[in-house]
């Protein structure tokens, strides 16, 4: 008998399994993962789902780290390299390069993707964090610098927004047969797969779990802090530990339709309303590295749980308080007031970061205020820019 996950519609209060069949909750208790994801994985003989390896003892300390911006909203042909005492900035803005036709250039669009390369002793590891809005931009930018997907050791998805996972399926399709077997993709929990809408009610998509598993990817559920590729620390879910009031960006709905969406049995009862509700981004995660003699480098993609909360969770998950660099989107945009942004900048400044790299959704007001408050420490991310830290970056 052939079973297809597309037959299953699991919405709050429904039971598609029927009398005499394995109940949905029984299946979940037996496996610890979503039933549709399990069936898809088994039938395809491809990907799998597992709990991520928790951080045990001291976090890994890398000798060097470089972070390349693969997808972002901004590009600048005339950006120049910068060397500072603790951070080297490589800018690649022009299009006239040997072997690259003039038609090839960086593609900027709304979204974010970062590529982290770390060195620990004789070992180099490469982690891709988020995948931009479209595969066209992501793959174009990867091709522009000759980034080989076969070198990737782990994938991390910060949260379930299309401008962060939109390029993933295209990357997996274009890299078929090239990726390392069982390549892990870290997500912050079942909530990452929920269907989402914009505040105006527009469809904002949902992450294609069956498609990911069909590509042979190993889904790693990282609700708690976990180690990725032996070098990075994924934050786990981020508590709201400060007085921050981050913007509500989208709405979410539980339920499985055609294998897409999140399983209501793995969501709190308060979310199983059968309709779209305010998105709390419980699943959002950040990625951090501890760089030898420098401190913590925090990669926060959108900071929907609050940028200060994200930093605090990174510090808690690594046991390292010294903030060497903060990179990513901070979501300090309208309608947040200037006073709110100024207070957040002051709170970040109080943490004494050595460097801040503002990308994606950080906002112009944040950038202007932060540069005034912390001159020579705040820089703008551009597509293609690479930021390097440590002695062997």
Predicted region positions:
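Zn-dependent metallo-beta-lactamase
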Residues: 10, 32-45, 50-123, 234-283, ...
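Pre-active-site segment of Zn-dependent metallo-hydrolases
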Residues: 102-110, 118-154, 170, 177, ...
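Active-site HxH/HxHxD metal-binding segment of metal-dependent hydrolases
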Residues: 153-224, 236-246, 346-354
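Cap/insert and terminal regions of metallo-dependent hydrolase folds
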Residues: 154, 161-165, 268-387
